[in-house]
């Protein structure tokens, strides 16, 4: 068991040719995906709002949030996902929001993303 990485292409939704590929750590404990801000700015992404965050070490921080087109290599699918502009030396993290958007869950035993059935609204939606 343990952490694993997947290859992700990150693109500007307004100009998809402006993009980069990187290995992202799959992090189900992170709500948002996290990318060094400089890399996002290089492809022309701008923030749409700020978000207060609690980091893994317990520190509180306010960071900028934007939206990017993510293509996860092993899924061969592209969706727009929220992304945090991290410090320039930060790790590349694929967070829970992106995983849910793609309808996948992390399976650390085989180090792969696996499809899951989406739950819509619980009890109220089933009425």
List where the protein language model places each region:
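Pepsin/retropepsin-fold aspartyl endopeptidases
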Residues: 1-127
């Amino acid at each position: 068991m343990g952490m694993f990485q997947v290859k992700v292409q990150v693109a500007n939704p307004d100009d998809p040719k402006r993009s980069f590929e990187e290995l992202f750590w799959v992090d189900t404990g992170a709500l948002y995906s996290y990318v060094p801000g400089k890399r996002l700015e290089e492809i022309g992404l701008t923030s749409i709002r700020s978000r207060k965050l609690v980091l893994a070490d317990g520190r509180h921080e306010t960071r900028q949030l934007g939206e990017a087109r993510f293509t996860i290599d092993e899924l061969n699918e592209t969706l727009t996902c929220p992304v945090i502009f991290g410090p320039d030396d930060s790790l590349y993290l694929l967070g829970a929001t992106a995983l849910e958007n793609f309808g996948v869950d992390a399976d650390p035993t085989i180090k792969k993303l696996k499809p899951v059935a989406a739950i819509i609204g619980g009890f109220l939606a089933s009425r």
